[in-house]
UniProtKB/Swiss-Prot annotation:
Protein EC: 5.2.1.8
The record's note on its domains: Consists of 3 domains; the N-terminus binds the ribosome, the middle domain has PPIase activity, while the C-terminus has intrinsic chaperone activity on its own.
HAMAP family: Trigger_factor_Tig
One GO process term, biological-process aspect: chaperone-mediated protein folding
Organism: Vibrio vulnificus (strain CMCP6)
Protein name: Trigger factor
Signal peptide as annotated in the record: none
Record's catalysed reaction(s): [protein]-peptidylproline (omega=180) = [protein]-peptidylproline (omega=0)
Gene3D superfamilies: 3.10.50.40, Trigger factor ribosome-binding domain, Trigger factor, C-terminal domain
Subcellular location(s) of the protein: Cytoplasm
Assigned GO CC terms: cytoplasm
Length: 432
């Protein structure tokens, strides 16, 4: 076998491979003999059919199969010989394929980028200095009260904190548009659910009032046909409601699974949950900055094959979120996923290089700690830990999580780390 390697654009490579004719012809002959020996032919005893007849009937198909097998096998031998690491399946193209002549073919494919980590010392990480304060717990209790609130109709004007039930019809240039019409639509005033100006137009209105408002859809509105358009809404207020918050008593506390200890026990449970969420949020914020810095300092080419694979993964995940229709999800345009897919591939390649450069191995104690911490969110943590320990696939997933955390720790060890005081709400409400 003769092999030459061509470097094409970017990460693309081409192997030019020559296989001696004898290799092909010997393989074809062996397969034809196998057919003659084991297949029945009319008018002949098994194994007694003439080889010329077998070759005439099956020679062409057998040769095509053999060529495919030979190209695949010799490609693998070639990349091992040349120490090449393909990032995806090759595309084969025969160049010389005459019977009795050497087989000449090429294989075009992408390789993984060569990554040399740099700039870890330039990465800046602001570690949030934050704790759960009494005021944060009280605010969370109020949020829980609002979630359990009831609404009572009142003879008052619409304002922030109240809820209105409205009918509305939207139009642009006098024409109604799709999605711009509703009846008995519940709208909590001050929640910011509607486009700018919509709630302002309802402010101060009372039950039975009918009126029109003029608004403009934002330029970044999700519906392409409405972006930046001026619209008119005809609105009728059917009723105005005020929120009735439940009292902080044992009945309220019991709704959250706290059987004893009253409101103090609920506050303690809420604080514990908030502290667990806060710890994870701090970890996520640090990880996000470390990865952002890693990507910024290390620009690399990305194999298109890996991006395609990741796009398919994202499509399948989308299908699971939206009813399991994989076929429909696979038809979604790749542009929806391309940026996220490329980012995930880049991060994966760079973190892999961090792991390699620092010779990191999975810390089994860290794996146990991650599982134990995660299990505290469940009613029976011991049962959860046991379930994970008895499931090898879940354990391998957790080992990957632990190894990634070890890689992040390695980045942070070389980065410029400072602390910044923030409140609980500031951190938890930061955009992703």
């Amino acid at each position: 076998m003769q092999v030459t390697v061509e470097t094409l654009e970017g990460l693309e490579r081409r192997l030019n491979i020559t296989v001696p004719a004898a290799n092909i012809e010997d393989a074809v002959t062996a397969e034809l003999r196998n057919i003659a020996k084991n297949r029945r032919f009319d008018g002949f005893r098994k194994g007694k059919v003439p080889m010329k007849m077998v070759a005439k009937m099956y020679g062409k198909a057998v040769r095509q199969d053999i060529l495919g097998e030979v190209m695949q096998r010799h490609f693998i031998e070639a990349i091992i010989k040349e120490k090449i690491n393909p990032a995806g399946a090759p595309t084969f193209a025969p160049v010389e394929n005459k019977e009795g002549s050497d087989l000449v073919f090429n294989a075009t494919f992408e390789v993984y980028p060569e990554v040399e980590l740099k700039g870890l010392e330039n990465i800046t990480v602001e570690k949030p200095a934050v704790e759960v304060k009494d005021a944060d717990v009280e605010e969370m209790i109020e949020t829980l009260r609002k979630q359990q609130a009831t609404w009572t109709e009142v003879e008052e004007a619409a304002e922030a904190g109240k809820r209105v039930s409205i009918d509305f019809v939207g139009s642009i240039d006098g024409e109604e548009f799709e999605g711009g019409k509703a009846e008995n639509f519940p709208l909590e005033m001050g929640a910011g659910r509607m486009i700018p100006g919509f709630e302002d137009g309802i402010e101060g209105k009372t039950k039975g009032m009918e009126f029109e408002i003029d608004v403009t859809f934002p330029e970044d509105y999700h519906a392409e046909n409405l972006k930046g358009k001026a619209a008119k809404f005809a609105i009728k207020v059917n009723k105005v409601e005020a929120r009735q918050l439940p009292e902080l008593n044992d009945e309220f506390v019991a709704k959250f699974g706290v059987a004893e200890g009253g409101i103090d026990a609920l506050k303690a449970e809420v604080r514990k949950n908030m502290e667990r969420e806060l710890k994870q949020a701090v970890k996520n914020r640090i990880k996000e900055q470390a990865i952002d810095g890693l990507v910024k300092e290390n620009e690399i080419d990305v194999p298109a094959a890996l991006i395609d694979q990741e796009i398919n993964v994202l499509r399948q995940q989308a299908a699971q979120r939206f009813g399991g229709n994989v076929e429909a999800a696979m038809q979604l345009p790749r542009e929806l996923f391309e940026e996220q897919a490329k980012r995930r591939v880049v991060v994966g390649l760079l973190l892999g290089e961090v792991i390699k450069a620092h010779e990191l191995k999975v810390d089994e104690e860290k794996v146990k700690a991650i599982i134990t911490e995660m299990a505290t969110a469940y009613e029976d943590p011991t049962e959860v830990v046991t379930y994970y320990e008895q499931n090898e696939q879940l354990m391998n997933n957790m080992r990957n999580v632990a190894l990634e955390e070890q890689a992040i720790d390695a980045i942070i060890a070389k980065a410029q780390v400072s602390e910044k005081e923030v409140s609980f709400n500031e951190l938890m409400n930061q955009p992703a």
